[in-house]
Amino acid sequence: MTQLINVNSRSYRLSSAPTIVICVDGCEQEYINQAIQAGQTPFLAELTGFGTVLTGDCVVPSFTNPNNLSIVTGAPPSVHGICGNFFFDQETQEEVLMNDAKYLRAPTILAEMAKAGQLVAVVTAKDKLRNLLGHQLKGICFSAEKADQVNLEEHGVENILARVGMPVPSVYSADLSEFVFAAGLSLLTNERPDFMYLSTTDYVQHKHAPGTPEANAFYAMMDSYFKRYHEEGAIVAITADHGMNAKTDAIGRPNILFLQDLLDAQYGARRTRVLLPITDPYVVHHGALGSYATVYLRDAVPQRDAIDFLAGIAGVEAVLTRSQACQRFELPEDRIGDLVVLGERLTVLGSAADKHDLSGLTVPLRSHGGVSEQKVPLIFNRKLVGLDSFDRLRNFDIIDLALNHLA
């Protein structure tokens, strides 16, 4: 078996012990802090004695797909190409959903590990990620969302519902993430993969603030699985795709800037196009509202004028040109607009008011997407060495850290 693989200009030492990398969707660090203070997460509370706790930066836009793909490629979106759920294809003049693996421009560490002879398993909460994460992977790969459809030929495993002992969970539930962890435990104790990637959903974090009973219960559930993985002898590495913040005013009303309406009023209809890369089929989570937007300008709209106009709107943190955004956030130039707009910590960006259905938001809006959700945990159940070689820790360094930097 090959002991070293090279993927996207980085080298990875293949692990001799089962290694589990976990992406906890929407894991603002305060969730862990509050759960520890409430006595709900004893394993995480004791981890500093034998493990390592660090903080890193996620990719901006701080959304699920760009960050999960960055983690499994060990590279930013400028390398792998996935910079959101949607981009605007200038040639076809259509908004394109980027859930298909054909938009992925780089190999994954997972697929390369499998080629090197390792047994690799991937379990995701939502099926939208399975196709991307499992690209060219010969191993085990399935989602909790469609666990009832899992079969040996397509997913590399079977009878997963019976093995886990849970029904197929609702996509809008904490159970969807628990299914991921329970499935991971079943795989660890039976097939014992060399490497496992588990990716959850941020349903709980979108609805419940850190320290609330619901949030603490969710983290207590995860903590119990982390402990089980540890007891089974696995190397456990935990990070997040992004953080999470309230996006409301002082009395809980959503703070929304409808950029398309504002731009239409300033420049006229159809002179600009606002694209929200957070948009996905699961709008109950966030109403397709996040703190990152990209804007396409028609010829008649001067870029400098549009930048000044948008930057002058209260709640806008920054407006960047395409080249500035690509340099700062390492994004692919052909998949973002002329401008990138970032909302402040308490503000989300919408397109037009009539394009957003907020009826599913039964609690004060919580979302992500901006720089304000960039700080994420990097937690390991082992001591690490050689960290001086990192100028800046990123969530997509986690596989490198787990495989190459164990003491």
UniProtKB/Swiss-Prot annotation:
Gene field: phnA
EC number(s) stated in the UniProt entry for this protein: 3.11.1.2
Any one GO molecular function term: phosphonoacetate hydrolase activity
Species for this entry: Pseudomonas cedrina
List of residues binding Zn(2+) 2: D202, H206, H368
NCBIfam families reported for this sequence: hydr_PhnA
Enzyme class: hydrolase
Record text on subunit structure and interactions: Homodimer.
Name recorded for this polypeptide: Phosphonoacetate hydrolase
GO biological process: phosphonoacetate metabolic process
Gene3D superfamilies attached to this UniProt entry: Alkaline Phosphatase, subunit A, Domain 2, Phosphonoacetate Hydrolase
Residues that, per the record, bind Zn(2+) 1: D25, T64, D241, H242
Named cofactor requirement(s): Zn(2+)
Residues given in the record as substrate binding sites: T64, D202, H242, H368
